[in-house]
A protein has these predicted regions:
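Aromatic-residue-lined binding/catalytic grooves and analogous aromatic/hydrophobic interfacial grooves
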Residues: 26-35, 52-76, 80-202, 308
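Elongated scaffold/linker segments in the mid-to-C-terminal portions of large proteins
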Residues: 125-297, 304-306
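Conserved, well-structured interaction surfaces
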Residues: 1-29, 42-53, 59-74, 263, ...
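Short, histidine-centered active-site or binding-site loop motifs used for metal coordination
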Residues: 38-40
Length: 308
């Protein structure tokens, strides 16, 4: 007997991961080499249409074999493994851009599979503010596998500062967007709760303008910016460690190398909403919610808008 005969569910999970990787290849590059088995021969090149057809067939085939759509916390068995909701989410992504991939739109199917996620036991996380951290912030914190936010996590990539130490994943997302002055903690503690502040990526003015359309963004730290914007998502920091203002815009192309040219983005952190310490001083505990229920709502909104 093959492994597929012995454990149908795990085999379906592995096939999902293969499909997800092929989806990204197709989406990013178009025509890509395709193979379903290890071989010394060069893999044949598939067109986007061929890849789309494979992905649709593969996901529809494995969906009934995956576990029931069930949100979990890090203490639950199976946390981090995909279930039916992940297949629905990937199908909705595939159908949303079907016109680009194949020439034929599939808005109805995109809406249908997004709705399956929306109607499942996975939900948008709307929990109470904890120690000053909003429900939105709790999605991107060091205890997001424990604080209740994982009810929204259709496919979490597990992180633990001791057990999965990595310079990539969520450590990159927080370290690359912080310098030592960025202050998002409601208690006024600067930084992201790791030792890493690489001062790299930051916001363009056009992003700030979405939250402050009247060009009136205040020069405050991120822990005050959300109140000024009236929006929990406005996690921008406008002050440097020495109290000097960050420039809201990069006026010249040669200024993009200076981190203070642009507001910092303080979305991902390694703080724990319950106030407990991180597991490691350097590496991140923050799970990466690669697929979130919020995406299903956005997909459904776009698909139905284009349908109508």
């Amino acid at each position: 007997a093959t492994f597929a005969d012995v454990d149908e569910t795990k085999t379906a999970e592995v096939r999902f991961l293969r499909a997800l990787n092929y989806y990204h290849l197709m989406d990013l590059y178009g025509n890509v080499p395709f193979t379903e088995q290890v071989s010394a021969k060069a893999a044949p090149q598939y067109t986007r249409k061929q890849m789309y057809d494979f992905l649709e067939k593969e996901l529809l085939e494995i969906e009934p074999k995956l576990s029931a759509a069930t949100p979990k916390k890090s203490t639950d068995a199976g946390y981090g493994r995909v279930d039916k909701a992940a297949a629905w989410m990937l199908l909705s992504r595939l159908y949303l851009n079907a016109q680009v991939y194949t020439g034929t739109p599939q808005w109805q199917k995109a809406a249908e599979y997004a709705k399956k996620v929306m109607d499942s036991n996975y939900k948008l996380y709307t929990g109470a503010t904890k120690n000053g951290w909003t429900a939105y912030q709790q999605l991107f914190m060091g205890d997001n596998g424990e604080n209740g936010a994982s009810v929204e996590a259709v496919f979490p990539i597990l992180q633990d500062g001791k057990k999965t130490a990595s310079w990539g994943s969520t450590l990159f997302l927080m370290a690359s967007t912080f310098d030592a002055g960025v202050t998002v903690n409601p208690n006024g503690v600067a930084g992201n709760n790791t030792s890493e502040n690489w001062a790299g990526n930051r916001a363009r003015k056009s992003l700030i303008d979405k939250f402050f359309p009247n060009n009136n963004a205040p020069y405050v730290h991120a822990n005050q910016m959300t109140a000024a914007a009236g929006d929990d998502r406005a996690l921008f920091d406008a002050l440097q460690a020495d109290g000097n203002k960050r420039n809201i815009d990069q006026a010249n192309a040669d200024q993009t190398g200076v981190f203070s040219n642009g507001f910092a983005v303080a979305k991902f952190t390694n703080f724990h909403s319950d106030g407990t310490a991180g597991h490691d001083a350097k590496f991140s505990d923050t799970d990466l919610f690669l697929m979130r229920v919020a995406e299903a709502y956005l997909t459904y909104a776009e698909a139905t808008a284009r349908l109508n």
